[in-house]
Amino acid sequence: MSSPLNNRGTCSRSSSARSRHSARVVAQTPVDAQLHAEFESSQRNFDYSSSVSAAIRPSVSTSTVSTYHQTMQRGLYIQPFGCLLAVHPDTFTLLAYSENAPEMLDLTPHAVPTIDQRDALAVGADVRTLFRSQSSVALHKAATFGEVNLLNPILVHARTSGKPFYAILHRIDVGLVIDLEPVNPVDVPVTAAGALKSYKLAAKAISRLQSLPSGNLSLLCDVLVREVSELTGYDRVMAYKFHEDEHGEVISECRRSDLEPYLGLHYPATDIPQASRFLFMKNKVRMICDCSATLVKIIQDDSLAQPLSLCGSTLRASHGCHAQYMANMGSVASLVMSVTISNDEEEDVDTGSDQQPKGRKLWGLVVCHHTSPRFVPFPLRYACEFLLQVFGIQLNKEVELAAQAKERHILRTQTLLWDMLLRDAPVGIFTQSPNVMDLVKCDGVALYYQNQLLLLGSTPSESEIKSIATWLQENHDGSTGLSTDSLVEAGYPGAAALREVVCGMAAIKISSKDFIFWFRSHTTKEIKWGGAKHEPVDADDNGRKMHPRSSFKAFLEVVKWRSVPWEDVEMDAIHSLQLILRGSLQDEDANRNNVRSIVKAPPDDTKKIQGLLELRTVTNEMVRLIETATAPVLAVDIAGNINGWNNKAAELTGLPVMEAIGRPLIDLVVVDSIEVVKRILDSALQGIEEQNLEIKLKAFHEQECNGPIILMVNSCCSRDLSEKVIGVCFVGQDLTTQKMIMDKYTRIQGDYVAIVKNPSELIPPIFMINDLGSCLEWNKAMQKITGIQREDVIDKLLIGEVFTLHDYGCRVKDHATLTKLSILMNAVISGQDPEKLLFGFFDTDGKYIESLLTVNKRINAEGKITGAICFLHVASPELQHALQVQKMSEQAATNSFKELTYIHQELRNPLNGMQFTCNLLEPSELTEEQRKLLSSNILCQDQLKKILHDTDLESIEQCYMEMNTVEFNLEEALNTVLMQGIPLGKEKRISIERDWPVEISRMYLYGDNLRLQQVLADYLACALQFTQPAEGPIVLQVIPKKENIGSGMQIAHLEFRIVHPAPGVPEALIQEMFRHNPEVSREGLGLYICQKLVKTMSGTVQYLREADTSSFIILIEFPVAQLSSKRSKPSTSKF
């Protein structure tokens, strides 16, 4: 993949990454569909090696892709280890069921069944009658629960036999799916309220993961696969990582000793299709018990418009090609778990709040294989999923640390290169150390400057580099450079001759004729897999058979013309160097003598004075903030003597500031805190900062009678201008009152009633849970801080019903918070030492509460752990008030959403009436012009109906939503867009003109015409809004370009321009179009959603400002439909 280095203000690192990812997904999906179709048609004769050539084959029909998606997401079969019921969520009437359900639920006895038994499992029957009363109540209650998956599994019993099942529920578009898995009689059943118990299965594994040192991703993955292997007992457990180009790699493995190793194996992107990756995001754990088992068909209500969606079903059947792949590698059963991390590329702008939920992206998979059939009960699978969530949190930290380390390295190298450039540009960055090769990972670099070459490392020859420079000037003269991981795909004619030396290249212009090149060799040089060394002859039919060894061959074939991709952070570094060079050298065209010119840096003295003035301002402001802070803050020098002591510290200890300054800190702490303080000081001198450490300060004067002051502190190193550590600052949180209550609780050995019922204002917020995770107590302080009354939480699940991800209960900001809370509760209930957690949630008024949560185990008279007692230490009222102000806008957004929901519902009926009226008019005898107007009217209604169904904005934002593919006439769609803009244009007395060639009227395409209409109409309305009558017309311009792909297939590359008079749309609104934030305006949200829809259609949006005009530029491509004699003549209506 190649990309020009253009300087565009709207481009960012994250948008670049998203564009590349979207392009790969779009490119891979038709290939996946084609391979699937070929497998289905050939079955056992399928040639796996064709996956290599599939990527360069001609196009795939949209019907093939649609059929493929339907098969992947809406298959008609399940695995036989359980049965499936689909019901209406309100009435529990049956919508669909699997053919094995009657047998599993004991509705088909050997005797002649009764009428009730025959009718109990029929479409339209009430499913609750199939289970005993207590089970029916549990299912009914679960159906009313927002996040129903948090209640899984629900233990139910069949009415006739009492046979126990785990009911695993999830919602789909038409109702509620209930997967029923029989409970093994020898297992102790886990009830819904006891879902917390399944976490205990993974408690030790979680502890081991959390105890690992940071900075070692390989060790983290090795421990994970080992723990999963011990938990599940599979013969082989592997950790897969997806690389940026979508191919996968086995980065860790735990296997049975006699099995072939797969560690280091790379496989092409087509091995795990994009549709499967989408399913892994929907269903985090996927089990196949026996890939050779006979599948079970689903019977569904004939009135359902399409087959049942099985994306979230635990029973979804395996696809034929996957089952054959497993069989070929000697695997009968498998368990696959997705590894997701925070998608920081979703938002590249700091919104000023960390409380907005971030999206997730698929980082990789943990894959388990077994050589015989294997069933893992749901509670154990749930424990594995929980373990993977913990791993995801740890992994997120590792990914962030690695990215930060890489950026720090680049910044250090850039600083040194800049210093060299001041003395000798640009030759110095090649002849001195470090040099330009140290900036980014590469195999060689070249400087082409004033018709001379300077080479480092492995590079093409001088003549070849000059040829590349000439090619860049002739073919990419409008850009400032080029980056590509494949010179072949970039179109360089001499790429084949360079393959053994160079495949990838990043090139920048430093003047009109001078370049710097970075080169990378092909990926295969960096690939090491032990399995490649001892390949048996014809073990896999020379790569034709689906097998990991064939996957490796296919991967090597795919990447033989490709290098490791250039990362965004690397391209940022290269681009920054380019800007420095272009600023320090005069362009050759402007300097006929070809003399280098170095821009003089400001005098050192001036810079130092300027820096000191800025530092003084910042220092004064920091001192003021520390002195007035509502938290205790103290500081010491390198000798450990106090040199900072704010008003809050003086208030708590009774020791005035002037008495504290200059005294050793160890003289002010109690005896059992001296070692802790010494350790903190020693670590700080080495540059290591500590968090959440407890120290006890002595009390003085009037506070002496209150005993020691207990602080939870974070340490941070104070440094001078040369980065030398000169002291330590402690920021603390007063836990004295809370600690006193907990000590009292410990002394009275669990007599919590005296504490929880105590009305004293000094009693902190307290709640309690039993060993099943249900809430037992919720004291007055907890009611006050959350706004939730005691009776509303008693007997409810703490995680899922009290603390939730939704608008009921106490909402937390993200799934990671619930995961951390679950870890803490599980650890304490399992008997581990008490822990603390920084914990935040929203109260019933939408105010965000930040607190420190401390959890202690509850023990009964026999010494058995019966649950946990939890104390919240909440931030000061001043901080709460500030957070409340910050969240007022969020509350307003919630109210707006409710109003929008009402309007959304009320619009449906009149819209249905309008559509009915139009349908009555269609058979009427109308003129050609009237028929065109009617057609545009119907398209407008279809577009409105489509928008009204857009309730899942998250799927739109993540570009995961499903697009329709229909044949449509482009001019009809464009005329419909113009019709939507004309009323506002007439109102503002602004004319709307169209500018497109006559061929548009005859152009029929495949794609989602309604989404295209929505996008263009919104951008047109925005242009109208910011245009004044006297400024000129608005023009909808279309520039088509057809490209032949293979024989008989064409792609239409379309450039839509909505040209309007300058100054155009305000810059702030354009920024909102590309960067969504909580304070987004109504117009900005509409533009943002349209931009996401365009990305989902594999297109891009730009906004161009010129001297007299501004333009929305939308670039999209659609397959051209084949000619059909049934089509109506092209539209020629004018506006």
From Swiss-Prot:
Domain PAS: 618-688, 748-822
Region (Disordered) residue spans: 1-26
Annotated keywords: Chromophore, Photoreceptor protein, Receptor, Repeat, Sensory transduction, Transcription, Transcription regulation
Modification after translation, per record: Contains one covalently linked phytochromobilin chromophore.
Domain GAF: 216-399
Source organism superkingdom: Eukaryota
UniProt-listed PANTHER family: OS08G0260000 PROTEIN, PHYTOCHROME 1
Function comment: Regulatory photoreceptor which exists in two forms that are reversibly interconvertible by light: the Pr form that absorbs maximally in the red region of the spectrum and the Pfr form that absorbs maximally in the far-red region. Photoconversion of Pr to Pfr induces an array of morphogenic responses, whereas reconversion of Pfr to Pr cancels the induction of those responses. Pfr controls the expression of a number of nuclear genes including those encoding the small subunit of ribulose-bisphosphate carboxylase, chlorophyll A/B binding protein, protochlorophyllide reductase, rRNA, etc.
Protein name per its UniProtKB record: Phytochrome C
Organism of origin: Sorghum bicolor
